[in-house]
């Protein structure tokens, strides 16, 4: 079988958004390259490739893909070169591409994300595995913003908390939280395809029994407070999310934010402050920032 490979040349900041556009256009697999895995790319230059099966007539889809990539700039996102290129690839190349780019990745000392088709075994008894189907959209769990999110979860969770995962995507953060002892998890995503992908990934990970996954726009209409709210999303979505958080965060609870490129950190901090939240700690990975925040108290 032949596949059509569509590659968008971009920068790190836009990688997740472009992956979503390509998935929504009918891609069956996404491959992300940046300087950490491809020597020919330097700095924050990145490439997102999507593989479409023969049954999809890709040239028909290209104008909309191009238009949606360009529209990202309207949300304040830098897209870099933004060029879109087509290539036919044979099945064998595709199989090799998966193997090359989706390797088990140790996110933290205790959590490793593993493509579902590998037989990777933990190297020690404390290493827990997050099994993900790499054919599904919304990240394989190896993006730096996901790394930061999992690191922040590991820093604040002690077990037994209630957690809300906003923009769950592949469900990776909910699976990580379940491994860290959280049983009461609500996972939401505005996109039904993402919710379906998350549910399928929950089924691959026995630890996730009982997670509620539903389509929802941010936290509109959600009731019932949580100890931890985690959101790895673009700043353009985090800004309207933040004012919804204080009503849903228990006293002493944490809001964990990732998906923030360094240039957008100031606007996120301003929005947090205007809504009675303060930054307890910030984590950095490349150009990305993760913020551990909590409600301000009288002592602050
Ligand atoms: C960068 S992905 C994060 C996926 C996953 N949580 C992770 O950390 O790898 C962002 C997700 O947010 C979702 N999203 C975007 N806007 C949203 C909204 N208004 N409400 C809920 N989810 C949203 C997207 O569909 C996407 O799945």
UniProtKB/Swiss-Prot annotation:
Instruction: Answer whether the UniProt record assigns the keyword Cell division to this protein.
Output: no
Q: Name one Pfam family in it.
A: PrmA
Q: Which reaction does it catalyse?
A: L-lysyl-[protein] + 3 S-adenosyl-L-methionine = N(6),N(6),N(6)-trimethyl-L-lysyl-[protein] + 3 S-adenosyl-L-homocysteine + 3 H(+)
**Top-level enzyme category:** transferase
Per UniProt, the keywords (alphabetical) are: Cytoplasm, Methyltransferase, S-adenosyl-L-methionine, Transferase
- Listed EC numbers: 2.1.1.-
Quote the subcellular location field of this record.
Answer: Cytoplasm
**Gene3D superfamilies, alphabetized:** Vaccinia Virus protein VP39
Question: GO cellular component terms?
Answer: cytoplasm
Protein family according to the UniProt entry: Belongs to the methyltransferase superfamily. PrmA family.
Function description: Methylates ribosomal protein L11.
Protein name (database record): Ribosomal protein L11 methyltransferase
Organism encoding this protein:
Latilactobacillus sakei subsp. sakei (strain 23K) (Lactobacillus sakei subsp. sakei)
Its organism's taxonomic lineage begins at:
Bacteria, Bacillati, Bacillota, Bacilli, Lactobacillales
